[in-house]
Amino acid sequence: MYKTESFKPDTFKPARFESDGKITLSGKEIPYHTICEDNVIYGPDGNPVASIFTYAYFRSDVEDTANRPVVFAYNGGPGSSCMYVHAGFLGTRRMQYDEVDRESAFGPYKVIDNPDCLIDVADIVLIDPVGT
């Protein structure tokens, strides 16, 4: 199992953040709920050994959530977070970029509503692997 040196189980306190938002897709306003949180991984002895961080977007006006599709996405790891998957094309907001060239590849970027977001048809969970 991959274990990061920066993970200190004795002092680690999992974080959790929640918010509500709205995005307009194809002229329709879509409400959603976001949960961003640490997910602790426990070893065979029951002690925490690592953590992954997730960004979850749930459409909040859906009545039948049992049949709603969920997209799970991650980018590499260890050492490669889901930042470009998240802020590049799957999140409800994304970086604004017209053409990415060598000089502008590292920003700064403006952040805009993502017109190609999938939240209208599926919930989205973005995963930062251990060590990112």
Question: Model segments located where?
Answer:
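N-terminal cap/lid subdomain of alpha/beta-hydrolase-fold enzymes
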Residues: 2-3, 48-132
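Catalytic-loop region of hydrolases
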Residues: 1-70
